[in-house]
Amino acid sequence: MRIGLIAIDGCFGSAVASVIDIVRVADGARGDVDPRIDPIELAILGPKRRVTTTASMTLTVDHPLSESGEFDVVVVPALGTLTAAATNDALQSRDARSVIASLGRLDDATTRIAAACTGVFAVAETGRMHHRRATTSWFLGPEFLKRYPTVALDLDTMVVVDGNLVTAGAAFAHIDLALSLVRSISPDLAQHVAKLLIIDERPSQAAFVAYEHLRHEDPIVVEFERFVRARLDEPFNVAFVAQSLGTSRRTLERRVRAALNLTPLGFVQRLRIERARHLSATTDLTSAEIALRVGYANAETLRSLLRRERRRS
């Protein structure tokens, strides 16, 4: 397998390094797992001869972007941004536009595209993600949905595979992305690499989501969040909340789904779990007392939800 890793000035340094290291360890270890596994080659693709990452790491580019189609897999790492505004600016840069143009020319039938974090935005800019499943950085989910409403975004899942499109979540999800590429070659090799590098399986990024950082501009969603945060200890009834906010249940459900990719009840459950974890870590309250503080009649109901979250994470 030939893997082309795209790099431009300002790309996330640890993202690039983690992909390089995992792929090269996999290539070095393949003979120990199964001598029939073909070599795994990795090369750097870019718009110029040398690029510098956010970690001030200088990379020598092996191939121009025009040769991207010669690789089996093209990996698009994070742009090195943490906010919607910075991501938008990065996407408008000359280098990013060159990357987007080269991605748009790839044949979906022959070249797999793998992207993580804000790199998924660059792939979405090509228009090739319409009505396809994907994930990206959890904290940029609302902005992604706003820009690309036809993408079926799944912010819970760490790595999403949809045909020849592979996407992963925030920042160090590049590790999971690289390991998924190795797994597509050989599950046994991926398991061996994970053991060598002590990589735990992380199928979900849900456990890392801090919902107070999900900034949404929809005034109904903002008021909904304020309303339920102030009443997490009370029973939740979506029709009652909608009426209290002066809107209909259908409108509230639609607007919350568009902003957060969750149902109103799903969002409330996440907020309750988040609050419960905070209370558990910062107070001496019993499990039963915490359960009451977050709207559950007994501790077992809360424990059941927490166990479910751990399994998903």
Language-model features: locations:
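Conserved anion/nucleotide-ligand pocket segment
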Residues: 161-196
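Conserved Rossmann-fold dehydrogenase catalytic segment
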Residues: 153-166, 192-212
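A conserved active-site-flanking secondary-structure segment within enzyme catalytic domains
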Residues: 130-157
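Short active-site oxyanion
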Residues: 108-113, 128-133, 164
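Extended, subdomain-level signal for the structured scaffold at the beginning of enzyme domains
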Residues: 1-113, 122-124, 190-191, 200-313
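Acidic/polar active-site rim loop that often engages polyanionic ligands
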Residues: 122-129, 174-175
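Predominant activation on well-ordered alpha-helical scaffold segments within soluble catalytic domains
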Residues: 17-20, 24, 145, 175-179
